[in-house]
Amino acid sequence: MIRSTLSSWREYLTPITHKSTFLTTGQITPEEFVQAGDYLCHMFPTWKWNEESSDISYRDFLPKNKQFLIIRKVPCDKRAEQCVEVEGPDVIMKGFAEDGDEDDVLEYIGSETEHVQSTPAGGTKDSSIDDIDELIQDMEIKEEDENDDTEEFNAKGGLAKDMAQERYYDLYIAYSTSYRVPKMYIVGFNSNGSPLSPEQMFEDISADYRTKTATIEKLPFYKNSVLSVSIHPCKHANVMKILLDKVRVVRQRRRKELQEEQELDGVGDWEDLQDDIDDSLRVDQYLIVFLKFITSVTPSIQHDYTMEGW
């Protein structure tokens, strides 16, 4: 809790900046956080902004109805140690630090654990994601016909075991003033709706991150004491900066290939018309990417659940 207290003081004392440095640092301003939150809620309506309430400790640099984002009752049907990673985070980050195939630019955020709903509809688990539109599609829920499987499962007496494993999480995304990036908080419940202890919530954090990234702390935006596990945001900006650079390289290469094709077809003015194109990831797409690399920290929480409500 000492670390949590120090973090709270740092958040309180760090001055707010409104100068955008997204493309150069991977950090965002409060205004850009709101912009990215609006986009997330538009694309995935189960994500909501907070409602105004007397229970909230407001920060005056954000609108009262846009202090934090929340999605409730996200399923978690197994523990993190039961998830087999396709690619370990160390391997993925090493790949980012080296000059490799630009086609794998978003493989970091697209890498998934073997999970009942982790594979996008119509996709394969090992397919690389190379565009933000495909990334958005990857977050959608795959429609499955579960009737036959459920009957067989019940016949084998597996339902009781499944209920013991079943958990749900409320996920919160707030703005970190000290790191100028989004910060994730998770609050867990068992199948009966009783709150999970911090130790139980840590079971759903990847072992690689439990002692490095996850912290027990109270939700800072509620006046009432609500215990959570937060995902420390110290590396978020660096990951986003690397990703931005990679996206830029991929899109520039594709544009060059398209230009060459157009020139072969006799379209000589194509290059002049494309000079003002922005090859970077848009700042409003920030949280889409943010949620994808959060899955490496909490692999058993079904983040793909965002396209369905309760």
UniProtKB/Swiss-Prot annotation:
A motif (ATG8 interaction motif (AIM)) lies at residues 270-273. GO terms for cellular component: cytoplasm; cytosol; mitochondrion; phagophore; phagophore assembly site. ATG12-ATG5 induces reorientation of the ATG3 structure, increasing conjugation activity of ATG3. Keywords: Acetylation, Autophagy, Cytoplasm, Mitochondrion, Protein transport, Transport, Ubl conjugation pathway. A 1,2-diacylglycero-3-phosphoethanolamine binds at M1, I2, R3, S4, T5, L6, S7. InterPro entries: Atg3/Atg10 (IPR007135). Induction: Expression is increased during filamentous growth and controlled by the RSF2 transcription factor. Acetylated by NuA4 complex acetyltransferase ESA1 at Lys-19 and Lys-48. Acetylation regulates autophagy by controlling ATG8 interaction and lipidation. Deacetylated by histone deacetylase RPD3. Residues 238-285 are annotated as: Handle region. It holds the Pfam family Autophagy_act_C. Residues 83-163 are annotated as: Flexible region. One of its GO terms (biological process) is autophagy of mitochondrion. One of its GO terms (molecular function) is Atg8-family conjugating enzyme activity. The active site is at C234. Present with 3610 molecules/cell in log phase SD medium. Monomer. Interacts with ATG8 through an intermediate thioester bond between Cys-234 and the C-terminal Gly of ATG8. Also interacts with the 40 amino acid C-terminal region of the E1-like ATG7 enzyme. Also interacts with the ATG12-ATG5 conjugate. The N-terminal region (residues 1-7) is involved in phosphatidylethanolamine-binding and is required for ATG8-PE conjugation. The flexible region (FR) is required for ATG7-binding. Belongs to the ATG3 family. This is Autophagy-related protein 3. It comes from Saccharomyces cerevisiae (strain ATCC 204508 / S288c) (Baker's yeast).
